[in-house]
Each structure stands twice: as structure tokens, then as C-alpha cells.
């Protein structure tokens, strides 16, 4: 645990070396990086996977700014708390927005970026995310949180539904049922404004790896090319037979690509 301006942040930490900070997406937590923590630590990196406020097992205070800028600021505060001046940032899905925002505002602190089907370019939202942004509808949807709903969402996110396990369903559902968690998730969804990131993305100069699933049903694979147009220095890896969560659905391929990308860039 790490205290950041009165907010208790849950972290998973392992290894020694250059810091790699993993940031999860919507309605997720550090469990999303379960397949990356040990391989990156064994490759001589200091691995930290955080739970953003209101997610996983971090606190969900009403005074936290559940916006892109608020979570971007929190990333900087976490780095300060870890006494780290520089970092390699790894982001999945909606976690891309605060990570990119932080990189744009503090380029001197970011050695490299790894984006796994990340937000940061204009795109349409899946139906569920549009619904929960509606007043009252989002609050009422808390009543329907169940293993079957979580399984449905994960199956949509994977190209191969057989890879969705009961353990995964339970792991993603459990934190959402904690007091304050669903309300914090709603505030995050409703406060998300990608404008600053979209307008300033091409200012990023650090090395970037873009990883995408060819069968991503939520962020079409064409988004990876749009990202590449804004970040011409980026390396792009497209995984076949893979959906929205490459680091979870094809972790061995993801880890191999990411660790190879980092060779010689930060050590």
C-alpha cells in the first residue's frame, strides 16, 4: 500500500531495476497484469502494478479527481512516493488516457511507453459504457453486477472465449462489489475527456510500442494505425486471434514483444 495525499493506493511490487509502472483499464485492477509481473521482474525490472482510486483494492474517496487529469496527477504522485524520477509506463485500454496525459505533461520522466489496445484516439464506446454514463442508469446497473455479466464482458474482450476462466470472472467482480467502487467507476467514466490527449499526442517523443489484437471488438485494429500516424517513432505489433486484452489473452507473445522492445532503451 502507498499513501498518496491521503488516498490509500494498492500496489503489487516485485523486482529491482528500472521502474515499470503498469496501469489498468476501466473496471479492472492490477490483476490485469498477473502474467507480466514475474517475467518483467525476472528480466531485472522493478515492477509496480497499481490500482487506480476506486478500482481493485485502492480507496475510493469522494474528493479524488476521477478524471483523466486527476489520474494523470496521481501517477506522478505515485512515482514521487516510490522515489522514482523516471519510469517506463505500460497501459491497457482506458488506462492509456492518464498515462498519455502524464507523458505529454512530463516528458522528462517517461523513458518509454507500451500501449496495449489503449485509448487515446477517437473511437466509439461499447454499449455498456455508454449506458452506465447515463444518470440513474449507471447507478441502477450496480444491482446487476454478477458473475454472468462479468463473464459476458470478458468474453466480448477476448477473441477466444475459452480463455476466460472462473477465476478471472471472480477476480474482476469482487473489487467492483466493494463499497464506493462502483460509484468511483461511474465518476471516472463520466469525467473522461480525451480532448487534451488527442490534441497533443503527436508531441510525445519517447520510444513507444503499440500492441493490438487483430480481433479487438472494442477498439478496432485500425486504431493502431491512427496511433502510429501520430507517433511515427512507434513500433507496432498486431496479434492474430487476439481481442482487446493482448497482455491477458496472449501474455507470452506480449511479454516477449515488450521485453525485446525495451532492450537497449532503458538499461
Task: Enumerate the language-model features and the residues they cover.
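Conserved HGGG/HGGXW glycine-rich cap/lid loop of the alpha/beta-hydrolase fold
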Residues: 7-57
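Conserved alpha/beta-hydrolase catalytic His-Asp/Glu region
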Residues: 9, 124-125, 143-203
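Active-site loop/oxyanion-hole signature of alpha/beta-hydrolase fold enzymes
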Residues: 12, 49-90, 94, 256
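Flexible "cap/lid" loop of the alpha/beta hydrolase fold
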Residues: 104, 111-141
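Short alpha-helix in the alpha/beta-hydrolase fold that links the catalytic acid
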Residues: 168, 206, 220-229
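Short beta-strand/loop motif that positions the catalytic acidic residue
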Residues: 204, 210-212
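Acidic catalytic loop of the alpha/beta-hydrolase fold
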Residues: 215-219
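Catalytic active-site module of serine/aspartate enzymes centered on a nucleophile-bearing elbow/loop
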Residues: 234-267
